[in-house]
Amino acid sequence: MSVALRSFAETSPRLTHLQRLEAESIHIMRETVAETENPVMLYSIGKDSSVLLHLALKAFAPGRLPFPLLHIDTTWKFREMIAFRDRRAKELGLDLLVYTNPDGLARGIGPVSHGSEVHTDVMKTQALRQALDKHRFDAAFGGARRDEEASRAKERVVSLRTAQHRWDPKRQRAEPWHLYNLKKRRGESLRVFPLSNWTELDIWLYIERENIPIVPLYYAAERPVVRREGQLIMVDDARLPLEPGETPELRKVRFRTLGCYPLTGAVESEAATLPEIIGETLAARTSERQGRVIDKDGAGAMERKKQEGYF
């Protein structure tokens, strides 16, 4: 190595692990916006969406976001999630689109009356496809991470979808040296995952470092829950019918992941601060998605959902 190169290497600032992840995510977002015509960010209100939004605001500062946010509202999210969504949209002046499957709404589709598979298909997957078609979005940012679940582990950062929004694992493109192929045929679209290489721990460390607001449900507090099939389900409103002999009890719980409340299990916890959550995450030996009922809809359930157009 020459003296000049050695001097540069010794004096140039070294990026931390979080700084490298941040830079990678911002690069992915900017590249996607530059190479697509009508991008959108899928906003599910959870911790990953909060980090994704924070990164987007950094990526395009000081200007406004060059794309809207899209929330697929199943009408079964926790009340605190919806309140948080509306508050953040107002605080940040976001262009927020909220979409609910009108047919599913008219039919009264829900996780209690129709089960998790039908509810997820109609109110999430079909709703998402409808919204993307309605607004003609050709690229959608999502907050999925590879460490969450097996099918997500093998999906590329830039995921090609057919005109019907289906995912074919065999059509994935190579992404050597962080080079992303954003080309597509007419009618096709892309799902783009800037957080692919982040872990659950990375997310929490970044939230702490950047002081990112998150839904209070992530913090431990006393909440009314019932135990069903090994899961602590929070009784968030009167739509959750109690089974014979079932009585909600107050337990100190928090959520590692958030979805539709009858399909999302809480964990007993004392972690009421970010350092305590980080400590719990370091000690955890189970996936954060252990509380997602939809992941238990049979072997390969998530991969089938993704092939049909799920997030």
From Swiss-Prot:
The keyword rRNA processing does not apply. Its EC number is 2.7.7.4. GO terms for biological process: hydrogen sulfide biosynthetic process; sulfate assimilation. It holds the Pfam family PAPS_reduct. It catalyses: sulfate + ATP + H(+) = adenosine 5'-phosphosulfate + diphosphate. One of its GO terms (molecular function) is ATP binding. The keyword Nucleotide-binding applies. It is an enzyme of class 2 (transferase). Belongs to the PAPS reductase family. CysD subfamily. Heterodimer composed of CysD, the smaller subunit, and CysN. HAMAP family: Sulf_adenylyltr_sub2. This is Sulfate adenylyltransferase subunit 2. It comes from Methylobacterium sp. (strain 4-46). The lineage of its organism: Bacteria, Pseudomonadati, Pseudomonadota, Alphaproteobacteria, Hyphomicrobiales.
